[in-house]
């Protein structure tokens, strides 16, 4: 007798990705695009991680709420995420703010971005909702979180991880009992409460929530009727449930997808220039903590058909070379030297130029004899011949967006203002 296979919970779930934020701490990098649309890892966009996690977890209904400067993001998803088939009970919906509930307002907060599309959610009739932030870099199997949600009988299950206490000021922070039931929750506290047995760490929300659909829709309607609400999950919905219902914490270590279990679970907010630079540079390690080469859990994305990368010239002072670097397709390293750098598609690096600790977005052109250290260079920038960045901190700060740790963000308008 063949045992009947139980359908994974993910097949009766919808992933709802919140992708409307600007990400203002990324400064000029989000002047033309929303944070989820920012390039990452040589080939992908940040949003591809949440979407790939959902797909790889078995979720086949996905909605993405967009708002701020969404053209680049929408175009990317239309090109790279158009393979869902309704005849297989699959769907992929892009949901710009469109005043579906109110004719006068855009999305007012994260909860409102779900509430305004409540009719679409009801039409699909799924049992569970997985609410995701579209601007984090990590690999996670949501099926484990769904299973914990069902087993615990929770009203909401919240993904969480341990972070250094002083870094927790930008997150929702929770206090749990020995059953991982949340007994207190505060959004972005100035003085984050520590984990009882780990005074230097706090338990931070990942912005991942699992609900039974009916419970979520009732909670959203109640919140929408409250004139004092800010329409936000972290500020309104979650604290209400913690106080009046049952909220359970799901620890990221239980569902993190990693190739090497000696590595710590990898999750990055990449919300600042420093964090964005570091997360990209992390990928140049011999064995990176975030494995983008894992074929069992691929990061799906839109990929142009491009020729291979090419390295040319082999003279003593003019040798195309790269060490400890990631170089994407259609790059030509023509007598240039790379070290500990990550190049996206279509970069041209010309003779005698040197790059170290460089994160270079697509279609950048590096002029001859340029010297670039610890930089993030935006899409399509043309670096003039002989430009030096990373040696004179004072000059760099006048010309570019330089962080306190010395990372320089370079955009084309900044280059256009140079007197060289």
UniProtKB/Swiss-Prot annotation:
CDD domains: ADP_Glucose_PP, LbH_G1P_AT_C. PROSITE patterns: ADP_GLC_PYROPHOSPH_1, ADP_GLC_PYROPHOSPH_2, ADP_GLC_PYROPHOSPH_3. Disulfide bonds: none annotated. One of its GO terms (molecular function) is ATP binding. Alpha-D-glucose 1-phosphate binds at residues 107, 172, 187-188, 205. Keywords: ATP-binding, Carbohydrate metabolism, Glycogen biosynthesis, Glycogen metabolism, Nucleotide-binding, Nucleotidyltransferase, Transferase. SUPFAM superfamilies: Nucleotide-diphospho-sugar transferases, Trimeric LpxA-like enzymes. It catalyses: alpha-D-glucose 1-phosphate + ATP + H(+) = ADP-alpha-D-glucose + diphosphate. Pathway: Glycan biosynthesis; glycogen biosynthesis. It is an enzyme of class 2 (transferase). GO terms for biological process: glycogen biosynthetic process. InterPro entries: ADP-Glc_PPase, ADP_Glu_pyroP_CS, GlgC_bac, GlmU/GlgC-like_hexapep, NTP_transferase_dom, Nucleotide-diphossugar_trans, Trimer_LpxA-like_sf. Pfam families: Hexapep_GlmU (PF24894), NTP_transferase (PF00483). Its EC number is 2.7.7.27. Homotetramer. NCBIfam families: glgC (TIGR02091), PRK00725.1 (NF001947), PRK00844.1 (NF002023). Belongs to the bacterial/plant glucose-1-phosphate adenylyltransferase family. Involved in the biosynthesis of ADP-glucose, a building block required for the elongation reactions to produce glycogen. Catalyzes the reaction between ATP and alpha-D-glucose 1-phosphate (G1P) to produce pyrophosphate and ADP-Glc. This is Glucose-1-phosphate adenylyltransferase. It comes from Rhizobium johnstonii (strain DSM 114642 / LMG 32736 / 3841) (Rhizobium leguminosarum bv. viciae).
